[in-house]
């Protein structure tokens, strides 16, 4: 994101957050102030802001009933609105729906890993095809782990799981080896500061250990450089489903960068 997005975000009544070493005006909330890991943004993605929020006046930032996150290309929608509606202000979420009343966490609707196109499977899944040519033909065998190995580094998820704490290691291993969908993009909405803090405590302790394995290599290809974001993306789904009363909610892709209709 950049300063060019500022007025658009303000028009949507959202709070703009600038990540990493980009130049942002003073109206932006920054992840490089106070206690932070902003310098890791290229590898951690949006997690550098989640860390900042966790470490700096967490309860103050949770002064409303819910705290939620989205991207400049992905927005929570009103449940009854058609996703293809081009009028963004009429389709995105602006208030807490009644359906959330008895829930603690909102996760985006599931992304199913068996939706990969054949061309991408042939390009990224060579090792899996050599090991088991039928792995992509069955919903049962096309799991989160197979998908991760194909796109983000063969065998790296297994290595990372070994570094998880005893309370989550086997549960997360079972999750990625048996499930065919997860709640992608590291986007969620949370009602409880304690729940948010508990998640961050487990997540960032794990990712810190993973740094000893994967480091901060800028030479990694694009689909692998954000290794800690990709790991947390899968872990987020597992952890909140295990530890919270959650609800799944629709998300729409809408890039505001070149939007001439709404702005």
PLM regions: where:
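ER/Golgi luminal nucleotide-sugar-dependent glycosyltransferases, focusing on the catalytic module
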Residues: 1-263
């Amino acid at each position: 994101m950049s300063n060019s997005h500022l007025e658009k975000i303000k028009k949507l009544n959202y709070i703009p957050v600038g990540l990493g070493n980009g130049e942002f005006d003073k109206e932006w909330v920054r992840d490089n102030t106070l206690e932070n890991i902003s310098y890791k943004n290229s590898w951690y993605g949006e997690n550098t802001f989640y860390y900042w929020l966790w470490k700096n006046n967490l309860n103050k930032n949770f002064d409303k009933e819910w705290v939620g996150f989205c991207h400049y290309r992905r927005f929570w929608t009103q449940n009854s609105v058609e996703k293809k509606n081009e009028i963004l202000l009429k389709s995105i979420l602006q208030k807490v729906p009644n359906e959330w009343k008895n829930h603690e966490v909102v996760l985006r609707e599931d992304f199913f890993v068996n939706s990969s196109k054949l061309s991408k499977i042939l390009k990224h899944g060579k090792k899996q095809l050599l090991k088991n040519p039928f792995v992509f033909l069955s919903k049962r065998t096309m799991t989160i782990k197979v998908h991760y190995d194909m796109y983000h580094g063969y065998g790296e998820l297994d290595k990372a799981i070994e570094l998880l704490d005893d309370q989550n290691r086997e549960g997360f291993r079972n999750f990625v080896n048996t499930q065919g969908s997860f709640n992608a993009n590291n986007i969620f909405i949370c009602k409880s500061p304690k729940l948010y803090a508990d998640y961050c405590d487990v997540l960032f302790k794990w990712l810190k250990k993973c740094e000893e394995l994967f480091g901060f290599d800028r030479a990694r290809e694009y689909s692998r450089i954000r290794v800690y974001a990709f790991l947390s993306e899968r872990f987020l789904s597992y952890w909140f489903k295990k530890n919270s009363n959650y609800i799944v909610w629709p998300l729409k892709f809408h890039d505001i960068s070149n939007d001439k209709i709404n702005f």
